[in-house]
Design a protein with these regions (language model features):
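Non-catalytic cap/lid and distal C-terminal segments of serine-dependent acyl enzymes
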Residues: 1-222
Length: 222
């Protein structure tokens, strides 16, 4: 059996939107991104860059509670995250790869802070090539996270050209696939696994469901 633990906030969508900005980001946004976030009532006034604190909460406070109440494995844990959650999962993978056996990284915001998270990729590669860690990592994204399909309407007040330019700049598919390919090229020990899946016909939001389905099969092989 597997135990699935979800972490929520319980104080309304605006509170959750602001709090996740702090909890799930490892660094500050670039000025242009910050301006856009400040223009939204859901994220205006949010703080950022507290991913390490949130990781400590999960491992030092939440994990002991789970282990005390359920017969969970201490050697076969999985971390799943989408969007900012995917960025958070990469932060943990790069800085604390031993914290989880499997990482399910869906539509990660790799471009956050000018792609600052990729500056720590080499830390993981060094540990892989030293034979110190052997994580299993599935990176996923939706096909239409980088290409605006004909049947998808852009946001109100935004032209198709502007929307496509934004998707191109985010480079979700390119970044996700590229990271998986680089990690696969590392001389990792037996047991390590790196895989990318791009879901045909899916957007940033609709990619969540196939990511969960394929992620469960990846984390819990028969």
């Amino acid at each position: 059996p597997a135990y699935i633990v979800g972490i929520g906030y319980g104080k309304g969508w605006e509170h959750a939107s602001r709090t996740r900005c702090a909890d799930l980001t490892p660094s500050q946004p670039d000025p242009a991104t910050l301006a856009g976030l400040e223009a939204s009532p859901l994220t205006k006034g949010a703080t950022y860059g507290e991913a390490e604190r949130y990781h400590r909460f999960m491992t030092e406070e939440l994990r002991p509670v789970i282990e005390a109440g359920y017969p969970v494995s201490r050697s076969d844990r999985t971390l799943w995250g989408h969007s900012f959650g995917g960025l958070f999962a990469l932060h943990v993978l790069f800085h604390h790869p031993e914290a989880y056996r499997t990482y399910l990284v869906n539509s990660p915001s790799i471009n956050w802070g000018g792609g600052a998270i990729l500056g720590y990729e080499s830390k993981l590669v060094a540990q892989l090539e030293a034979g110190k860690v052997a994580p299993r990592v599935l990176l996923t994204a939706g096909e239409y996270e980088e290409r605006l399909a004909d049947h998808i309407k852009p946001y109100p007040g935004v032209t198709r050209e502007q929307m496509q330019a934004a998707l191109t700049a985010f480079a979700m598919v390119t970044n996700t696939r590229g990271l998986a390919e680089r990690l696969k090229a590392a001389k990792a020990p037996a047991g390590a696994q790196f895989q990318a899946m791009i879901f045909e016909g899916e957007t940033h939001l609709s990619a969540i469901m196939p990511a969960m389905s394929r992620g469960l099969r990846f984390a819990l092989p028969a």
